[in-house]
Amino acid sequence: ADNVAVAIVNLPAGEHLSVDGIEITLNEDIPAGHKFALKNFAEGENVIKYGYPIGHARMAKKQGDWMNETNIKTNLAGLLDYTYNPIQVSLDIPHKDLTFKGYRRKNGDVGVRNEIWIIPTVGCVNGIIGQLAEGLRRETEGKGVDAIVAFPHNYGCSQLGDDHENTKKILRDMVLHPNAGAVLVVGLGCENNQPDVFREFLGEFDEDRVKFMVTQKVGDEYEEGMEILRDLYAKASKDERTDVPLSELRVGLKCGGSDGFSGITANPLLGMFSDFLIAQGGTSVLTEVPEMFGAETILMNRCKNEELFEQTVHLINDFKEYFLSHGEPVGENPSPGNKAGGISTLEEKALGCTQKCGKSYVSGVMPYGERLQKKGLNLLSAPGNDLVAATTLAASGCHMVLFTTGRGTPFGTFVPTMKISTNSTLAKNKPGWIDFNAGVIVENEPMEKTCERFIDYIIKVASGEFVN
């Protein structure tokens, strides 16, 4: 049983509380989202939240004391020896014949947006692709497709080895993404990421919808590019939405700017939705591997077979070995914002983070840059950094990223990035950032009711409703 509790609102020192029959008087002010002790702690005694240790007491603490990063220390150290202890997953979730309005592509895949993307092979042409996107927007007055977007980046040259290969993989995944109704790939000509080699690297693609321009090989790159874009626009603008079963939806699960409510409201909501989507035959993807440390065995024991278990061990230990090889401790993850919001250790963050994927079996484990092959719950190799992780989720083929936040963030990647607030204060203060408020879950709306509303909203977004 948990031996700390979380304050839903700011609680003053001297407040008398009854928690699960335990009478408590608070010894100090407890900010909303933060923990207080339900018992007296001896130095070194484990602090339990979500039913698992989140660290140990650095010093003796009294019942009613504020428990935070100053008095809780992580239990995480180096590499661990893991044992496969599979559990039986039994989820009684009814199948519903739900559909959304998506775009059926020539290869049979489905997109939830119909956008024209301009993707550079190298950062040297960033200015050109921006001019082209703006030019097409002016000509079309923003009509006919969902968006016309240039995707500048700083890579594609002065890169070798894995760095270069990873750049190629992510750019390939973008070019092939079904949310793009048409793509213009713009190269320079002398870069490491050679356009003709990159073209071969794509594998099969729709040559009517993916075009290339090498700027060193044309006279006026703006006029040449606009001519190609007009042709792509003429084709993409004829695409229409059609009914698509929910089983074809793929979502990425992400959190950033987490707080003490993340593991109580928004992340469990995503977990409930993920289980529902998987029960309908759909797909969800969890990443942020370093933020699994401390909760990884929960995922390992839900792997469908021992091969997936071994792949998950490799996924976890690869990141741990990377940190250790650079002299970095594996447990120093929580940011200043996390701590201010009530998260004290990486274990606490991880136990909240992994709730986003519900209770379903793990059916796939993916390296960085790989595209989705299996339905169900997939684990994807990427760091906790919001920009990298969200982009990797989108590159894997996710139609949208479901992003929970307690502190707030405006970031979005190249697919619809829905922000779900963990608390109502954030939703009220940042309506331009937040798309869905999960804070109502601690305001007496049952999780099941919130999830029903969330499912309806996801279907609307998949069918074309824009997010902030």
Describe the function of each predicted region.
Residues 1-400, 407-468:
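Metallocofactor- and cofactor-centric catalytic cores in central/energy metabolism, strongly enriched
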